[in-house]
Amino acid sequence: MDSTAQQFPLNHDLQVQKDQKGVVEEDEEQIHKRIRNYESHSGFSEYCTLFGHEKSVTCVSVSPNKRWIATSSSDGTIKIWSALTFRLECTLFGHYRGISQVKWATGSKYLASASDDKTIRIWDFEKRCSVRCLKGHTNYVSSIDFNPLGTLLVSGSWDETVRIWNLQDGTCLRMLPAHSEPIISVSISADGTLCATASYDGMARIWDVLSGQCLKTLVEPINVPLSNLQFTENRKYLLVSNLNSQIRLWDYRRNRVVRIFDSHVNTRYSMSWDCYSSKNIPKNTEALPNNDSSYPDDAESFMHDAYLLIPSEDGTIQITDPSTKIIIDDSIRHSDDPETSLLNVTSLGPFIITSGTDPYVRVWAPSLLLSKHEKDGFSP
């Protein structure tokens, strides 16, 4: 098996196929309407490429203060880049196998990394060194997340368990036998009270962080592995992606799906998405509304003034209006190599940052914005 658990395909004998019962069907006219680009927007252009990693870039994480970009790779390193100049600041060494994820803590001083060496490392960015190594998982650590205070960290692993760590002394407070297959993603709610987990067993679960009690189990309508999940900022919904090329917006309190995004390709990898301010792309008032009555009005506000950045394994990004599901832009293509899959997309002001199964990190900006500014004077 290759070195980064979160980013590599499942066993070849596990074939994921489309199941018509779990897919929202659309006629050809609806599809063409939904993928129509806004006429007032002229796409994105590559601003720069960040070189340095030797293998696939598994995660891109922007610091809360928007000053730094951390990238992790299956080459076992973390690189920190300036978000102002996009120049390499430092490289952090410590893991001896691939790194699946890197996350910043509140305050932008500390960050954590999850590795295939079965450990989690806490890094002091100011000192440029690892200050703690968390051991306990018995298989690849695939995902991590800090609570808002930066006092706790939750980790998910291929050993099918979730661990909750006290970062003051590095002790494991709880070990939860959470799933029957590898855990691919964990997410803590904005208020720090809930933790969500996604697994290859096709289930997402909601946990109480303090008690470790499972509060809710969300079951996909078809038996397909999950690939990622994330709480929305308003804490009301959970975005859950699966390897049937779908992202579902769950109202987990009512146990129902209120949105399905299914125009991208995701059948092999765990991929991350992000939000992108709608202020960076002019609105087209002629955009067609979504008249599908299966989507209730109470889901319209789950992303305020933002689009959803959805990566696709064909190398493109779909900038999608979450209210109408109209694809605003799909001009970004991470690589011309058909063998390279796009894995991660992250926003930084007007910039969009992409990484994939190649060793490059690419930075993109709206073409209209680039045409008005000299590159040397253009920054987030």
UniProtKB/Swiss-Prot annotation:
The Set1 complex specifically methylates 'Lys-4' of histone H3. Component of the Set1 complex composed of ash2, sdc1, set1, shg1, spp1, swd1, swd2 and swd3. CDD domains: WD40 (cd00200). It is found in: Nucleus. Keywords: Nucleus, Phosphoprotein, Repeat, WD repeat. It comes from Schizosaccharomyces pombe (strain 972 / ATCC 24843) (Fission yeast). One of its GO terms (molecular function) is histone binding. Its main location: nucleus. It comes from the Eukaryota. One of its GO terms (biological process) is transcription initiation-coupled chromatin remodeling. This is Set1 complex component swd3. SMART domains: WD40 (SM00320). WD repeats lie at residues 52-91, 94-133, 136-177, 179-219, 221-262, 291-330, 335-374. The modification Phosphoserine is found at S379. InterPro entries: Ebi-like, G-protein_beta_WD-40_rep, WD40/YVTN_repeat-like_dom_sf, WD40_repeat_CS, WD40_repeat_dom_sf, WD40_rpt. GO terms for cellular component: chromatin; cytosol; nucleus; Set1C/COMPASS complex. PROSITE patterns: WD_REPEATS_1, WD_REPEATS_2, WD_REPEATS_REGION. The keyword Transcription regulation does not apply.
